[in-house]
Regions:
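Residues that scaffold the ATP/ADP-binding catalytic core of kinase and kinase-like folds
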Residues: 85-87, 176, 225
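Aromatic/histidine-rich interaction motifs
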Residues: 88-109
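Basic/polar phosphate-binding segments, predominantly the helix-turn-helix DNA-binding elements
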Residues: 148-177, 199-221
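Terminal helix-turn-helix DNA-binding modules in bacterial transcription factors
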Residues: 168-205, 227-235
């Protein structure tokens, strides 16, 4: 089973983990994974070996699974909530990071370090701007439960919203809202709430719906994939 520690901020997460079992999955977040003590195996849309001491960037919406079980990995996750004005290319092939980028990832020791590294990474990656009408919505998404509500807050027609969200995030509005729902649910779980509390906070119909969505987006269920982690919430 998975174990380790998770540092969770707004739009980002840093996970130091011993790999457990998971299923191939993809998500809205971009993932950068560093092989700590032995080679890392990436399977899914692309089958790759990441040598120990190297890191790989897996773009959003790329189907993947990490291995082998028992290996140590440090993974950084970045999504549009970290910096609402920027977006990275979705669906591109995984790429190895430069030695400088890899060293910076390995040196992160605090929330401030993590946010600084993420900002530098976005700057180097030539992240492109998200439509300005969505920036305010992404900064305070808690009251949004439907694509219609998202369109109303952003002052967009439903059809225009679909065009913009698909262009900027690579998913339809409903999928973006599901990702935001999952984040709210996980934050509640991290804060000490039970599965029922987490499901309610995320706007899921019930615990099983939350569990299925977690497996779909993260490759693990809450009980199997998150229960053995120590969490730190970073403001």
């Amino acid at each position: 089973s998975w174990s380790g520690s998770i540092m969770l901020g707004t739009g980002w997460a840093l996970i130091d983990a011993r790999i457990g079992s998971s299923r191939p999955h993809n998500h809205v977040a971009h993932q950068i994974s560093l092989a700590i003590e032995r080679d890392l195996e990436i399977s899914g849309d692309a089958d790759l070996i990441v040598p120990a001491g190297h890191a790989i960037a897996i773009a959003s919406h790329v189907r993947h699974r990490l291995g082998p079980p028992g290996a140590l990995v440090r993974s950084f996750y970045l999504d549009p909530l970290f910096r609402a004005g920027t977006r990275l290319s979705a669906g591109s092939a995984p790429v190895l990071l430069t030695p400088i980028e890899t060293a910076g990832l390995g040196d992160i020791a605090s929330g401030a370090d993590a946010k600084r590294w993420a900002s530098d990474y976005l700057d180097r990656s030539q992240a492109r701007p998200v439509d300005a009408r969505l920036s305010e919505v992404l900064a305070a998404p808690d009251d949004l439960s439907t694509a219609r509500a998202l369109a109303d807050v952003a002052c967009l027609s439903p059809s225009r919203l679909r065009e913009i969200v698909s262009r900027d995030f690579g998913v339809p509005p409903a999928k973006l809202l599901q990702w935001l729902q999952l984040q709210r649910a996980v934050r509640t779980l991290v804060g000490g709430g039970g599965l029922a509390d987490a499901a309610a906070a995320g706007g899921f119909a019930d615990q099983s719906h939350f569990t299925r969505r977690c497996a779909q987006w993260l490759g693990v269920t809450p009980s199997a994939g998150l229960s053995a982690f120590a969490f730190e919430i970073v403001p």
